[in-house]
Amino acid sequence: MNGTLDHPDQPDLDAIKMFVGQVPRTWSEKDLRELFEQYGAVYEINILRDRSQNPPQSKGCCFVTFYTRKAALEAQNALHNMKVLPGMHHPIQMKPADSEKNNAVEDRKLFIGMISKKCTENDIRVMFSSFGQIEECRILRGPDGLSRGCAFVTFTTRTMAQTAIKAMHQAQTMEGCSSPMVVKFADTQKDKEQKRMAQQLQQQMQQISAASVWGNLAGLNTLGPQYLALYLQLLQQTANSGNLNTLSSLHPMGGLNAMQLQNLAALAAAASAAQNTPSGTNALTTSSSPLSVLTSSAGSSPSSSSSNSVNPIASLGALQTLAGATAGLNVGSLAGMAALNGGLGSSGLSNGTGSTMEALTQAYSGIQQYAAAALPTLYNQNLLTQQSIGAAGSQKEGPEGANLFIYHLPQEFGDQDLLQMFMPFGNVVSAKVFIDKQTNLSKCFGFVSYDNPVSAQAAIQSMNGFQIGMKRLKVQLKRSKNDSKPY
Protein backbone atom coordinates (compact mmCIF):
# COMPACT_ATOMS: atom_id res chain seq x y z
CA MET A 1 0.00 0.00 0.00
CA ASN A 2 1.07 3.52 -0.64
CA GLY A 3 1.20 5.35 2.66
CA THR A 4 2.32 8.78 1.51
CA LEU A 5 2.25 11.82 3.74
CA ASP A 6 -0.28 13.47 1.44
CA HIS A 7 -3.03 10.98 2.25
CA PRO A 8 -4.49 9.20 5.27
CA ASP A 9 -4.32 5.44 5.66
CA GLN A 10 -7.62 4.94 3.81
CA PRO A 11 -8.81 6.28 0.43
CA ASP A 12 -11.56 8.89 0.20
CA LEU A 13 -15.14 7.69 0.72
CA ASP A 14 -15.96 8.26 -2.95
CA ALA A 15 -12.81 6.59 -4.30
CA ILE A 16 -13.29 4.13 -7.18
CA LYS A 17 -11.83 0.66 -7.54
CA MET A 18 -10.86 0.30 -11.21
CA PHE A 19 -10.45 -2.83 -13.32
CA VAL A 20 -7.54 -2.66 -15.78
CA GLY A 21 -7.08 -5.06 -18.69
CA GLN A 22 -4.54 -5.47 -21.51
CA VAL A 23 -1.45 -5.20 -19.29
CA PRO A 24 1.67 -7.33 -19.94
CA ARG A 25 1.68 -10.62 -18.01
CA THR A 26 5.31 -9.98 -17.12
CA TRP A 27 4.57 -6.72 -15.32
CA SER A 28 4.88 -6.62 -11.56
CA GLU A 29 3.02 -4.47 -9.04
CA LYS A 30 5.97 -2.08 -9.12
CA ASP A 31 5.68 -1.62 -12.90
CA LEU A 32 1.96 -0.95 -12.61
CA ARG A 33 2.42 1.49 -9.75
CA GLU A 34 4.87 3.53 -11.82
CA LEU A 35 2.27 3.71 -14.59
CA PHE A 36 -0.66 4.73 -12.39
CA GLU A 37 1.10 7.14 -10.01
CA GLN A 38 1.47 9.61 -12.87
CA TYR A 39 -2.20 10.43 -12.24
CA GLY A 40 -2.33 10.35 -8.44
CA ALA A 41 -1.35 8.46 -5.32
CA VAL A 42 -2.23 4.75 -5.46
CA TYR A 43 -3.76 3.05 -2.43
CA GLU A 44 -3.74 -0.55 -3.63
CA ILE A 45 -2.93 -2.72 -6.67
CA ASN A 46 -4.09 -6.32 -6.97
CA ILE A 47 -2.86 -8.36 -9.95
CA LEU A 48 -5.23 -11.17 -10.95
CA ARG A 49 -3.32 -14.46 -11.16
CA ASP A 50 -3.98 -17.96 -12.46
CA ARG A 51 -3.71 -20.12 -9.31
CA SER A 52 -3.69 -23.34 -11.31
CA GLN A 53 -0.09 -22.65 -12.33
CA ASN A 54 2.91 -22.96 -10.07
CA PRO A 55 3.95 -20.32 -9.35
CA PRO A 56 0.68 -18.43 -10.10
CA GLN A 57 0.95 -16.43 -13.33
CA SER A 58 -0.55 -13.02 -14.11
CA LYS A 59 -3.74 -13.06 -16.19
CA GLY A 60 -2.81 -9.74 -17.78
CA CYS A 61 -5.24 -7.67 -15.73
CA CYS A 62 -5.50 -6.08 -12.29
CA PHE A 63 -7.50 -3.92 -9.90
CA VAL A 64 -6.22 -0.52 -8.85
CA THR A 65 -7.60 1.83 -6.20
CA PHE A 66 -6.47 5.46 -6.03
CA TYR A 67 -6.77 7.56 -2.91
CA THR A 68 -9.06 9.99 -4.73
CA ARG A 69 -11.87 9.61 -7.21
CA LYS A 70 -10.42 12.42 -9.30
CA ALA A 71 -7.14 10.55 -9.83
CA ALA A 72 -8.99 7.40 -10.93
CA LEU A 73 -11.05 9.30 -13.48
CA GLU A 74 -8.00 11.13 -14.82
CA ALA A 75 -6.18 7.82 -15.23
CA GLN A 76 -9.17 6.34 -17.04
CA ASN A 77 -9.42 9.32 -19.40
CA ALA A 78 -5.72 9.11 -20.23
CA LEU A 79 -5.37 5.33 -20.54
CA HIS A 80 -8.64 3.66 -21.54
CA ASN A 81 -8.51 2.80 -25.26
CA MET A 82 -5.64 5.31 -25.54
CA LYS A 83 -2.34 3.73 -24.48
CA VAL A 84 -0.88 0.43 -25.73
CA LEU A 85 1.64 -1.05 -23.32
CA PRO A 86 4.87 -2.74 -24.54
CA GLY A 87 4.28 -6.18 -26.06
CA MET A 88 0.49 -5.73 -26.25
CA HIS A 89 -1.65 -5.53 -29.41
CA HIS A 90 -4.61 -3.66 -27.93
CA PRO A 91 -4.91 -0.49 -25.80
CA ILE A 92 -5.47 -0.56 -22.05
CA GLN A 93 -9.04 -1.23 -20.91
CA MET A 94 -9.85 0.66 -17.71
CA LYS A 95 -13.29 0.92 -16.12
CA PRO A 96 -14.90 0.84 -12.67
CA ALA A 97 -14.98 -2.65 -11.19
CA ASP A 98 -18.33 -4.43 -11.06
CA SER A 99 -18.57 -3.71 -7.34
CA GLU A 100 -18.52 0.02 -8.15
CA LYS A 101 -21.39 -0.02 -10.64
CA ASN A 102 -23.98 0.39 -7.90
CA ASN A 103 -22.60 3.88 -7.39
CA ALA A 104 -22.12 4.80 -11.05
CA VAL A 105 -21.99 8.49 -11.96
CA GLU A 106 -25.12 8.21 -14.12
CA ASP A 107 -27.08 7.15 -11.03
CA ARG A 108 -26.05 10.30 -9.14
CA LYS A 109 -25.99 12.93 -11.86
CA LEU A 110 -28.83 15.46 -12.04
CA PHE A 111 -29.98 17.69 -14.88
CA ILE A 112 -31.10 21.13 -13.68
CA GLY A 113 -33.21 23.05 -16.17
CA MET A 114 -34.92 26.44 -16.14
CA ILE A 115 -32.23 28.19 -14.11
CA SER A 116 -31.46 31.87 -14.46
CA LYS A 117 -28.80 32.59 -17.06
CA LYS A 118 -27.21 34.90 -14.49
CA CYS A 119 -26.40 31.95 -12.19
CA THR A 120 -22.80 30.79 -11.84
CA GLU A 121 -21.50 27.35 -10.89
CA ASN A 122 -20.97 28.64 -7.36
CA ASP A 123 -24.60 29.80 -7.15
CA ILE A 124 -25.79 26.32 -8.15
CA ARG A 125 -23.46 24.67 -5.63
CA VAL A 126 -24.81 26.85 -2.84
CA MET A 127 -28.37 26.10 -3.93
CA PHE A 128 -27.87 22.30 -3.80
CA SER A 129 -25.14 21.85 -1.17
CA SER A 130 -27.68 21.35 1.62
CA PHE A 131 -28.62 17.96 0.14
CA GLY A 132 -25.14 16.46 0.35
CA GLN A 133 -21.60 16.54 -0.97
CA ILE A 134 -21.40 17.74 -4.58
CA GLU A 135 -18.81 15.99 -6.71
CA GLU A 136 -19.21 18.12 -9.82
CA CYS A 137 -21.23 21.14 -10.90
CA ARG A 138 -21.24 22.36 -14.49
CA ILE A 139 -23.37 24.94 -16.28
CA LEU A 140 -23.99 24.27 -19.97
CA ARG A 141 -22.72 27.12 -22.11
CA GLY A 142 -22.93 27.99 -25.79
CA PRO A 143 -20.00 28.72 -28.12
CA ASP A 144 -20.19 32.34 -26.96
CA GLY A 145 -19.60 31.25 -23.36
CA LEU A 146 -23.05 32.34 -22.21
CA SER A 147 -25.20 30.11 -20.02
CA ARG A 148 -27.93 28.07 -21.72
CA GLY A 149 -30.03 28.12 -18.57
CA CYS A 150 -29.31 24.56 -17.47
CA ALA A 151 -26.67 22.65 -15.54
CA PHE A 152 -25.48 19.24 -14.35
CA VAL A 153 -24.91 18.48 -10.67
CA THR A 154 -23.34 15.21 -9.53
CA PHE A 155 -23.66 14.13 -5.89
CA THR A 156 -21.51 11.50 -4.19
CA THR A 157 -24.50 9.21 -3.53
CA ARG A 158 -27.80 8.50 -5.29
CA THR A 159 -29.71 9.13 -2.06
CA MET A 160 -28.49 12.73 -2.00
CA ALA A 161 -29.57 13.17 -5.61
CA GLN A 162 -33.05 11.77 -4.90
CA THR A 163 -33.45 14.11 -1.93
CA ALA A 164 -32.52 17.08 -4.12
CA ILE A 165 -35.11 16.08 -6.74
CA LYS A 166 -37.89 15.82 -4.15
CA ALA A 167 -37.07 19.19 -2.62
CA MET A 168 -36.15 21.28 -5.66
CA HIS A 169 -38.12 20.02 -8.67
CA GLN A 170 -40.58 22.79 -9.68
CA ALA A 171 -40.03 24.41 -6.27
CA GLN A 172 -39.30 27.89 -7.66
CA THR A 173 -39.33 29.94 -10.84
CA MET A 174 -36.06 31.76 -11.36
CA GLU A 175 -35.48 35.17 -12.91
CA GLY A 176 -35.92 35.19 -16.67
CA CYS A 177 -37.52 31.72 -16.78
CA SER A 178 -41.00 30.98 -18.12
CA SER A 179 -41.64 27.92 -15.94
CA PRO A 180 -40.46 26.38 -12.64
CA MET A 181 -37.06 24.80 -12.19
CA VAL A 182 -36.67 21.25 -13.54
CA VAL A 183 -34.62 18.82 -11.45
CA LYS A 184 -34.32 15.22 -12.67
CA PHE A 185 -31.76 12.48 -13.24
CA ALA A 186 -29.65 13.20 -16.31
CA ASP A 187 -30.15 10.99 -19.35
CA THR A 188 -27.96 7.91 -19.39
CA GLN A 189 -26.13 6.75 -22.50
CA LYS A 190 -28.87 4.17 -23.03
CA ASP A 191 -31.53 6.90 -22.84
CA LYS A 192 -29.65 8.96 -25.42
CA GLU A 193 -29.34 6.01 -27.79
CA GLN A 194 -33.05 5.28 -27.45
CA LYS A 195 -33.97 8.87 -28.26
CA ARG A 196 -31.62 8.84 -31.24
CA MET A 197 -33.25 5.65 -32.53
CA ALA A 198 -36.72 7.11 -32.04
CA GLN A 199 -35.78 10.25 -33.98
CA GLN A 200 -34.21 8.20 -36.75
CA LEU A 201 -37.28 5.99 -37.03
CA GLN A 202 -39.63 8.96 -37.02
CA GLN A 203 -37.70 10.61 -39.85
CA GLN A 204 -37.80 7.42 -41.90
CA MET A 205 -41.53 6.97 -41.37
CA GLN A 206 -42.21 10.58 -42.32
CA GLN A 207 -40.28 10.07 -45.55
CA ILE A 208 -42.37 6.99 -46.28
CA SER A 209 -45.57 8.88 -45.54
CA ALA A 210 -44.53 11.74 -47.80
CA ALA A 211 -44.08 9.31 -50.66
CA SER A 212 -47.86 8.64 -50.61
CA VAL A 213 -47.44 4.89 -51.05
CA TRP A 214 -50.18 4.04 -48.58
CA GLY A 215 -53.21 4.15 -50.85
CA ASN A 216 -54.18 0.59 -49.89
CA LEU A 217 -52.88 -2.30 -47.83
CA ALA A 218 -50.83 -3.60 -50.76
CA GLY A 219 -48.58 -0.58 -50.15
CA LEU A 220 -47.22 -2.34 -47.07
CA ASN A 221 -45.00 -4.37 -49.41
CA THR A 222 -42.96 -1.23 -50.08
CA LEU A 223 -41.95 -0.96 -46.43
CA GLY A 224 -38.42 -2.35 -46.21
CA PRO A 225 -37.43 -4.96 -43.61
CA GLN A 226 -34.97 -2.51 -42.07
CA TYR A 227 -37.82 -0.23 -40.95
CA LEU A 228 -39.81 -3.06 -39.41
CA ALA A 229 -36.72 -4.47 -37.74
CA LEU A 230 -35.89 -1.05 -36.34
CA TYR A 231 -39.41 -0.86 -34.93
CA LEU A 232 -38.99 -4.24 -33.25
CA GLN A 233 -35.58 -3.32 -31.86
CA LEU A 234 -36.94 -0.09 -30.40
CA LEU A 235 -39.92 -1.93 -28.92
CA GLN A 236 -37.65 -4.47 -27.27
CA GLN A 237 -35.34 -1.85 -25.78
CA THR A 238 -38.24 0.28 -24.63
CA ALA A 239 -40.03 -2.68 -23.08
CA ASN A 240 -36.87 -3.71 -21.22
CA SER A 241 -36.33 -0.18 -19.90
CA GLY A 242 -39.99 0.27 -18.92
CA ASN A 243 -40.07 3.71 -20.56
CA LEU A 244 -43.14 3.91 -22.84
CA ASN A 245 -42.73 7.63 -23.48
CA THR A 246 -40.36 6.86 -26.33
CA LEU A 247 -43.05 4.79 -28.05
CA SER A 248 -45.82 7.30 -27.59
CA SER A 249 -43.68 10.01 -29.19
CA LEU A 250 -43.40 8.11 -32.45
CA HIS A 251 -45.55 9.54 -35.23
CA PRO A 252 -46.57 6.12 -36.66
CA MET A 253 -47.57 4.85 -33.22
CA GLY A 254 -49.82 7.80 -32.47
CA GLY A 255 -52.94 5.67 -32.90
CA LEU A 256 -52.14 3.55 -29.86
CA ASN A 257 -53.38 4.33 -26.36
CA ALA A 258 -51.34 3.66 -23.21
CA MET A 259 -52.76 0.17 -22.66
CA GLN A 260 -52.05 -0.86 -26.25
CA LEU A 261 -48.52 0.51 -25.98
CA GLN A 262 -47.96 -1.54 -22.84
CA ASN A 263 -49.29 -4.70 -24.47
CA LEU A 264 -47.22 -4.20 -27.61
CA ALA A 265 -44.12 -3.46 -25.54
CA ALA A 266 -44.79 -6.60 -23.50
CA LEU A 267 -44.94 -8.67 -26.67
CA ALA A 268 -41.62 -7.21 -27.78
CA ALA A 269 -40.08 -7.87 -24.36
CA ALA A 270 -41.17 -11.49 -24.55
CA ALA A 271 -39.60 -11.80 -27.98
CA SER A 272 -36.37 -10.32 -26.67
CA ALA A 273 -36.33 -12.61 -23.64
CA ALA A 274 -36.94 -15.68 -25.78
CA GLN A 275 -34.33 -14.96 -28.44
CA ASN A 276 -32.10 -17.82 -27.34
CA THR A 277 -34.93 -20.35 -27.37
CA PRO A 278 -34.05 -23.17 -29.81
CA SER A 279 -36.68 -23.87 -32.41
CA GLY A 280 -37.11 -26.54 -34.99
CA THR A 281 -39.34 -24.31 -37.08
CA ASN A 282 -36.75 -21.79 -38.25
CA ALA A 283 -37.02 -23.14 -41.76
CA LEU A 284 -40.59 -21.89 -42.08
CA THR A 285 -40.57 -19.20 -44.74
CA THR A 286 -42.69 -18.08 -47.62
CA SER A 287 -41.87 -17.49 -51.24
CA SER A 288 -44.39 -14.73 -51.68
CA SER A 289 -44.01 -11.22 -50.35
CA PRO A 290 -43.69 -11.44 -46.54
CA LEU A 291 -46.04 -8.58 -45.88
CA SER A 292 -48.65 -9.77 -48.35
CA VAL A 293 -48.76 -13.08 -46.48
CA LEU A 294 -49.08 -11.26 -43.19
CA THR A 295 -51.98 -9.17 -44.40
CA SER A 296 -53.81 -11.94 -46.23
CA SER A 297 -53.60 -14.36 -43.33
CA ALA A 298 -55.18 -11.74 -41.09
CA GLY A 299 -58.42 -12.52 -42.84
CA SER A 300 -58.57 -16.18 -41.84
CA SER A 301 -61.53 -17.16 -39.72
CA PRO A 302 -61.23 -19.00 -36.41
CA SER A 303 -62.26 -22.25 -38.03
CA SER A 304 -59.77 -21.97 -40.85
CA SER A 305 -57.01 -21.06 -38.39
CA SER A 306 -57.48 -24.28 -36.51
CA SER A 307 -57.82 -26.51 -39.56
CA ASN A 308 -55.20 -25.00 -41.82
CA SER A 309 -51.76 -24.20 -40.46
CA VAL A 310 -50.34 -22.68 -43.63
CA ASN A 311 -51.39 -19.04 -43.30
CA PRO A 312 -50.49 -18.21 -39.69
CA ILE A 313 -47.30 -20.26 -39.66
CA ALA A 314 -46.17 -18.97 -43.04
CA SER A 315 -46.87 -15.50 -41.74
CA LEU A 316 -44.65 -16.13 -38.75
CA GLY A 317 -41.95 -17.27 -41.10
CA ALA A 318 -42.44 -14.06 -43.02
CA LEU A 319 -42.15 -12.04 -39.84
CA GLN A 320 -38.92 -13.88 -39.09
CA THR A 321 -37.66 -13.03 -42.58
CA LEU A 322 -38.46 -9.36 -42.05
CA ALA A 323 -37.09 -8.82 -38.57
CA GLY A 324 -34.79 -11.73 -37.82
CA ALA A 325 -31.72 -10.49 -39.62
CA THR A 326 -31.24 -7.28 -37.66
CA ALA A 327 -33.34 -7.66 -34.56
CA GLY A 328 -32.50 -11.28 -33.70
CA LEU A 329 -36.12 -12.40 -33.70
CA ASN A 330 -36.78 -16.01 -34.65
CA VAL A 331 -39.86 -18.22 -34.67
CA GLY A 332 -38.80 -19.63 -31.33
CA SER A 333 -38.83 -16.11 -29.95
CA LEU A 334 -42.40 -15.62 -31.05
CA ALA A 335 -43.47 -18.68 -29.08
CA GLY A 336 -42.51 -16.81 -25.93
CA MET A 337 -45.19 -14.23 -26.63
CA ALA A 338 -48.06 -16.69 -26.35
CA ALA A 339 -48.42 -16.28 -22.60
CA LEU A 340 -49.13 -12.58 -23.07
CA ASN A 341 -52.10 -13.03 -25.37
CA GLY A 342 -55.29 -15.08 -25.38
CA GLY A 343 -54.87 -15.74 -29.07
CA LEU A 344 -56.80 -18.71 -30.39
CA GLY A 345 -57.35 -20.27 -26.99
CA SER A 346 -57.05 -24.04 -26.84
CA SER A 347 -58.21 -24.72 -30.40
CA GLY A 348 -54.64 -25.37 -31.50
CA LEU A 349 -53.59 -26.57 -34.92
CA SER A 350 -54.52 -29.92 -36.37
CA ASN A 351 -51.15 -30.63 -37.97
CA GLY A 352 -49.96 -32.76 -35.07
CA THR A 353 -47.28 -30.42 -33.79
CA GLY A 354 -49.13 -29.77 -30.54
CA SER A 355 -48.74 -26.89 -28.16
CA THR A 356 -45.76 -25.30 -29.95
CA MET A 357 -47.80 -24.59 -33.06
CA GLU A 358 -50.67 -23.35 -30.90
CA ALA A 359 -48.32 -20.99 -29.08
CA LEU A 360 -46.98 -19.68 -32.38
CA THR A 361 -50.46 -18.98 -33.67
CA GLN A 362 -51.37 -17.23 -30.43
CA ALA A 363 -48.24 -15.12 -30.66
CA TYR A 364 -49.05 -14.09 -34.21
CA SER A 365 -52.57 -13.24 -33.13
CA GLY A 366 -51.20 -11.04 -30.35
CA ILE A 367 -48.96 -9.07 -32.69
CA GLN A 368 -51.81 -8.78 -35.16
CA GLN A 369 -54.14 -7.29 -32.57
CA TYR A 370 -51.97 -4.29 -31.74
CA ALA A 371 -50.54 -3.81 -35.22
CA ALA A 372 -54.09 -3.09 -36.38
CA ALA A 373 -54.41 -0.07 -34.12
CA ALA A 374 -51.14 1.38 -35.42
CA LEU A 375 -51.86 0.84 -39.12
CA PRO A 376 -54.02 3.92 -39.80
CA THR A 377 -51.36 6.38 -38.72
CA LEU A 378 -48.86 4.82 -41.13
CA TYR A 379 -50.84 6.28 -44.03
CA ASN A 380 -50.46 9.63 -45.67
CA GLN A 381 -51.87 12.14 -43.20
CA ASN A 382 -53.42 14.39 -45.84
CA LEU A 383 -55.35 11.41 -47.21
CA LEU A 384 -56.59 10.51 -43.74
CA THR A 385 -57.75 14.05 -43.08
CA GLN A 386 -59.64 14.25 -46.34
CA GLN A 387 -61.34 10.90 -45.78
CA SER A 388 -62.29 11.58 -42.19
CA ILE A 389 -64.23 14.76 -43.04
CA GLY A 390 -67.86 13.72 -42.99
CA ALA A 391 -67.19 9.96 -43.17
CA ALA A 392 -67.39 9.09 -39.45
CA GLY A 393 -70.99 8.73 -38.31
CA SER A 394 -72.39 9.03 -41.82
CA GLN A 395 -74.65 6.37 -43.35
CA LYS A 396 -74.02 7.33 -46.97
CA GLU A 397 -73.79 4.24 -49.14
CA GLY A 398 -71.33 3.45 -51.88
CA PRO A 399 -71.98 1.59 -55.14
CA GLU A 400 -73.20 -2.01 -55.24
CA GLY A 401 -70.64 -4.37 -53.69
CA ALA A 402 -68.83 -1.58 -51.83
CA ASN A 403 -70.87 -1.63 -48.60
CA LEU A 404 -69.77 -3.75 -45.64
CA PHE A 405 -71.47 -5.07 -42.52
CA ILE A 406 -69.10 -5.46 -39.51
CA TYR A 407 -70.09 -7.55 -36.52
CA HIS A 408 -68.35 -8.32 -33.17
CA LEU A 409 -66.96 -4.80 -32.74
CA PRO A 410 -65.54 -4.00 -29.28
CA GLN A 411 -68.06 -2.26 -27.00
CA GLU A 412 -65.90 0.85 -26.74
CA PHE A 413 -65.50 1.32 -30.52
CA GLY A 414 -67.08 4.47 -31.95
CA ASP A 415 -67.57 5.82 -35.46
CA GLN A 416 -64.07 7.30 -35.61
CA ASP A 417 -62.45 4.03 -34.46
CA LEU A 418 -64.34 2.10 -37.13
CA LEU A 419 -63.35 4.64 -39.76
CA GLN A 420 -59.66 4.51 -38.89
CA MET A 421 -59.62 0.71 -38.86
CA PHE A 422 -60.99 0.44 -42.41
CA MET A 423 -59.38 3.48 -44.04
CA PRO A 424 -56.18 1.64 -45.10
CA PHE A 425 -58.11 -0.33 -47.74
CA GLY A 426 -59.50 2.57 -49.74
CA ASN A 427 -61.59 5.73 -49.72
CA VAL A 428 -64.29 5.40 -47.02
CA VAL A 429 -67.45 7.38 -47.74
CA SER A 430 -69.17 6.46 -44.46
CA ALA A 431 -68.55 4.56 -41.23
CA LYS A 432 -71.28 4.08 -38.63
CA VAL A 433 -71.44 2.13 -35.35
CA PHE A 434 -75.02 1.44 -34.30
CA ILE A 435 -76.04 2.68 -30.85
CA ASP A 436 -78.88 1.42 -28.66
CA LYS A 437 -81.14 4.46 -28.24
CA GLN A 438 -82.26 3.42 -24.76
CA THR A 439 -78.89 2.58 -23.21
CA ASN A 440 -76.78 4.81 -25.48
CA LEU A 441 -74.31 1.91 -25.76
CA SER A 442 -72.87 0.33 -28.88
CA LYS A 443 -74.72 -2.64 -30.35
CA CYS A 444 -71.26 -3.96 -31.39
CA PHE A 445 -71.99 -3.84 -35.13
CA GLY A 446 -71.76 -1.23 -37.83
CA PHE A 447 -71.49 -0.40 -41.52
CA VAL A 448 -68.59 0.82 -43.67
CA SER A 449 -69.01 1.97 -47.27
CA TYR A 450 -66.27 2.51 -49.86
CA ASP A 451 -66.45 4.31 -53.18
CA ASN A 452 -65.51 1.11 -55.04
CA PRO A 453 -66.06 -2.68 -54.66
CA VAL A 454 -62.33 -3.49 -54.91
CA SER A 455 -61.58 -1.73 -51.61
CA ALA A 456 -64.49 -3.55 -49.96
CA GLN A 457 -63.15 -6.94 -51.08
CA ALA A 458 -59.66 -6.04 -49.82
CA ALA A 459 -61.16 -5.12 -46.44
CA ILE A 460 -63.09 -8.40 -46.25
CA GLN A 461 -60.02 -10.45 -47.13
CA SER A 462 -57.85 -8.82 -44.47
CA MET A 463 -60.32 -7.97 -41.69
CA ASN A 464 -62.79 -10.87 -41.60
CA GLY A 465 -61.71 -12.95 -38.61
CA PHE A 466 -59.29 -10.27 -37.46
CA GLN A 467 -58.87 -10.44 -33.68
CA ILE A 468 -59.32 -7.36 -31.49
CA GLY A 469 -59.04 -8.21 -27.81
CA MET A 470 -61.12 -11.32 -27.21
CA LYS A 471 -63.30 -10.79 -30.30
CA ARG A 472 -62.91 -11.71 -33.95
CA LEU A 473 -64.47 -9.38 -36.46
CA LYS A 474 -67.07 -10.66 -38.89
CA VAL A 475 -66.86 -8.63 -42.10
CA GLN A 476 -69.11 -9.30 -45.09
CA LEU A 477 -70.90 -7.49 -47.89
CA LYS A 478 -74.10 -5.73 -46.98
CA ARG A 479 -76.97 -7.17 -48.99
CA SER A 480 -78.73 -5.01 -51.53
CA LYS A 481 -81.98 -3.23 -50.71
CA ASN A 482 -83.87 -5.64 -52.96
CA ASP A 483 -83.10 -8.54 -50.60
CA SER A 484 -85.48 -9.31 -47.76
CA LYS A 485 -82.65 -8.93 -45.20
CA PRO A 486 -80.14 -6.10 -45.10
CA TYR A 487 -77.37 -8.55 -44.13
UniProtKB/Swiss-Prot annotation:
GO terms for biological process: cellular response to polyamine macromolecule; cerebral cortex development; mRNA destabilization; mRNA splice site recognition; negative regulation of cell population proliferation; negative regulation of epithelial cell proliferation; negative regulation of gene expression; positive regulation of gene expression. It comes from the Eukaryota. Residues 277-310 are annotated as: Disordered. Residues 283-310 have a biased composition (Low complexity). One of its GO terms (cellular component) is cytoplasm. The modification Phosphothreonine is found at residue 4. Residues 16-99, 108-188, 402-480 form the RRM domain. Keywords: Acetylation, Activator, Cytoplasm, Isopeptide bond, mRNA processing, mRNA splicing, Nucleus, Phosphoprotein, Repeat, RNA-binding, Ubl conjugation. The modification N-acetylmethionine is found at residue 1. Gene3D superfamilies: 3.30.70.330. RRM1 and RRM2 domains preferentially target UGU(U/G)-rich mRNA elements. This is CUGBP Elav-like family member 1.
